[in-house]
């Protein structure tokens, strides 16, 4: 028996050692020449396929603030939540949304697009912070299943299918008679339509349609009847998709919402409520993603643009003007933005704006502030505290010269700024020369007292050389000034000579003999000359002409009087 027990124990030991070896073999770090890929296909919501994103940098400091969308505390989870609701028939969309607001005891609710009271189906209800995404959901495409009744029989099913197919593309529509909007003609796009079923006996047509937001299916049914030549109207309608959420994406009823809140109130069980409400990130999964560093998150929440240093990862095929979602490393949506760079520029550029913000989703101060911590900002805070800058950080009387030189620049473009920046350097150079001259004088005085004659000679020669250089510079400047003054005087003299010549020409023209033909020529010549002369000279010439004419008239009058006598 003892031998049997010993053999049993040996077998057990062998089995254990084999299992341990297998385990160690599984968990040993294998030598590899490449980084093993992480399978992120099962990661939640915005983090799905995270490894396929382009990496700008992997260096950032993780901050413990914020929560993964599915692991937020319940109250925060509800505030950042959306419900894919199956709207019941008869109550209006606004009534349904108001009931949910009252059931969940929240501040705000919104929906993805109004459904008529009799229409059922998909209605995305946004709660509190998620209401900021309502506009984007209202403009998203929609899908419907409709039952239309034709006013008389159409025997050929193919004819119905052709008529339905012709109602695709851009279509003119006027809102129905019973509608809450102004009945203006508008253009809406119908992307696709399929005939699902046709009952010739009851004249019923069942079809599926994918269309632009704001399309009236009731009007489409009337148009279908007109195309078939029998008339028709809408019998029933159900929305099966709104944006990216459809009937199969966790659609719940009003009863589910009420029951989930009741279960939580009575048994503190969150699971049902978390199943009914989804994180708002669910409706942003169709957007291109930009992953932001934790230190840049709060700045974006305050409205700052996303710059290159704050970017961690980015998606392929981003163009300028593309709508993108800015997300944290935990998978939270920060904001919806508009890209200012393409994917290739993001990969190569080291500065600039990546995206500007369209709508901020995240609350401010969810993450700590991480701007204003650099040396420049801390210096500014210190100056404000000491009263050397005003409370807005603007210079006052006590502001140090160094700070104001760096901060306050004249307006008027780069040229003026460059000139202003260059001017102080010349002044500095003159000041330095002056200081150097004073230092030389001091050295000279000191050297005269000192007994070493060699050093004094050197200093004297240096001073003499410096003075000669200064005199040369001054003399060259004076020469330049004199040359400029002489040039100006020469130009002024030449202008005076030209004016005198013009006056002489005018006088010669005026002194010509007055005859009817010569007077006309004289006027033409005077006009040509007057065009080239200043306004003052013109007035003088006109006065002299008038005087001469008066004299001529007087002479003629005298001659006529003499003839009469």
From Swiss-Prot:
The active site is at residue 116. It catalyses: a uridine in RNA = a pseudouridine in RNA. Keywords: Isomerase, Nucleus, Phosphoprotein, Ribonucleoprotein, Ribosome biogenesis, RNA-binding, rRNA processing. Pfam families: DKCLD, PUA, TruB_C_2, TruB_N. The keyword Nucleus applies. One of its GO terms (molecular function) is RNA binding. InterPro entries: Dyskerin-like, PsdUridine_synth_cat_dom_sf, PsdUridine_synth_N, PUA, PUA-like_sf, PUA_sf, tRNA_PsdUridine_synth_B_fam, TruB_C. CDD domains: PseudoU_synth_hDyskerin, PUA_Cbf5. Residues 546-557 have a biased composition (Basic residues). One of its GO terms (biological process) is pseudouridine synthesis. Component of the small nucleolar ribonucleoprotein particle containing H/ACA-type snoRNAs (H/ACA snoRNPs). Component of the telomerase holoenzyme complex at least composed of TERT, CBF5, POT1a and a telomerase RNA template component TER1. Interacts with POT1a. NCBIfam families: CBF5 (TIGR00425), PRK04270.1 (NF003280), unchar_dom_2 (TIGR00451). Plays a central role in ribosomal RNA processing. Probable catalytic subunit of H/ACA small nucleolar ribonucleoprotein (H/ACA snoRNP) complex, which catalyzes pseudouridylation of rRNA. This involves the isomerization of uridine such that the ribose is subsequently attached to C5, instead of the normal N1. Pseudouridine ('psi') residues may serve to stabilize the conformation of rRNAs. This is H/ACA ribonucleoprotein complex subunit 4. It comes from Arabidopsis thaliana (Mouse-ear cress). The gene is CBF5.
